[in-house]
């Protein structure tokens, strides 16, 4: 938010008496950390993108390398997805039979991740055949997905249906290395309880086929991330919650008004094109 916008609110008689609080969060520089013994393909990928791993990404990477279950709760746009995708890709490179299951609460989210995985597959020159497997997956494609895909993206509703047919998934379950539960803050209340039982069924089936997959949870900021992760999966977790990505300076005005309407919003627009107003 520009200084002129803040000054306008502080000085204009129409607004100044309704300002509850003004807060400025200073800019933050990125903090990086190198991961030792990266697979050469991962090293080449990062070089091709002219990218370095933030410290929280490296901590996530190292925890996954050390066979720990991880929950990462850094903010949106901090690189959570890359933090867990790269170590999973490294396992896929080094173990050609390894598989991973990504669970999303909404179809749109899984489609977004599918595009990310397809780009990684191409960039790393590996064969993982990522696919979504849900209610919209054509029956004509389901057999090939079960037999050939190394990363499958699904949702709790579809997972509930396919667990009973686990004999059709023997190849996938017997090589299952990772279970990724993204947007895990969705799983609360009755829905969360049902998904927790579903995850326990999934674990039992994976164990039946000789697999003991790692869990990777990604979430928005939570008050009790370790408790959520444990209740959802029954496992112990390593928490990564310190955001080390760069951030610009941010200004917040908490404004008390029962008539926060067109006039106030138009004042924002006249001052700058970069402000966002939240009303409730």
Predicted regions, residues:
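Conserved helix/coil segment N-terminal to the catalytic DExD/H
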Residues: 135-177
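Conserved ATPase-coupling elements of RecA-like P-loop NTPase cores
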Residues: 113-114, 161-167, 183-198
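Walker A/P-loop NTP-binding motif
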Residues: 62-66, 81-96, 200-203
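Conserved helix-turn-beta segment of the N-terminal RecA-like "Helicase ATP-binding" lobe
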Residues: 109-134, 231-237
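Helicase-associated low-complexity/disordered flanking segments
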Residues: 1-59, 66-69, 128
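Conserved SF1/SF2 helicase motif Ia
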Residues: 90-113, 207-211
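Conserved interdomain linker/interface between the two RecA-like ATPase lobes of SF2 helicase motors
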Residues: 218, 222, 226-280
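Post-DEXD/H (motif II) to motif III coupling segment of the RecA-like Helicase ATP-binding lobe
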Residues: 185-245
């Amino acid at each position: 938010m520009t200084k002129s916008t803040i000054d306008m609110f502080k000085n204009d008689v129409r607004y100044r008496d309704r300002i509850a609080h003004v807060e400025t969060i200073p800019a933050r520089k990125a903090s990086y950390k190198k991961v030792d013994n990266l697979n050469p393909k991962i090293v080449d990928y990062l070089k091709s993108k002219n990218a370095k791993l933030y410290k929280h990404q490296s901590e996530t990477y190292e925890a996954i390398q050390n066979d720990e279950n991880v929950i990462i709760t850094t903010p949106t746009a901090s690189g959570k997805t890359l933090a867990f995708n790269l170590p999973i890709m490294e396992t896929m490179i080094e173990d050609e039979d390894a598989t991973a299951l990504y669970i999303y609460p909404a179809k749109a989210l899984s489609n977004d991740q599918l595009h990310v995985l397809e780009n990684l597959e191409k960039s790393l020159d590996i064969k993982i055949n990522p696919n979504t497997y849900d209610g919209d997956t054509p029956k004509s494609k389901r057999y090939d997905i079960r037999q050939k895909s190394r990363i499958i993206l699904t949702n709790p509703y579809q997972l509930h249906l396919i667990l009973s047919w686990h004999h059709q998934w023997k190849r996938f379950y017997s090589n299952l290395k990772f279970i990724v539960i993204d947007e895990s803050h969705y799983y609360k209340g009755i829905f969360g309880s049902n998904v927790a039982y579903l995850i326990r069924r999934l674990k039992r089936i994976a164990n039946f086929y000789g697999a003991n997959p790692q869990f990777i949870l990604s979430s928005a900021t939570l008050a009790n991330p370790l408790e959520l992760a444990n209740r959802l999966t029954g496992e112990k977790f390593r928490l990564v919650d310190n955001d080390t990505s760069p951030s610009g300076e941010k200004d917040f005005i908490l404004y008390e008004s029962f008539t926060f309407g067109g006039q106030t919003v138009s004042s924002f627009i006249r001052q700058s094109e970069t402000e966002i107003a939240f009303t409730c």
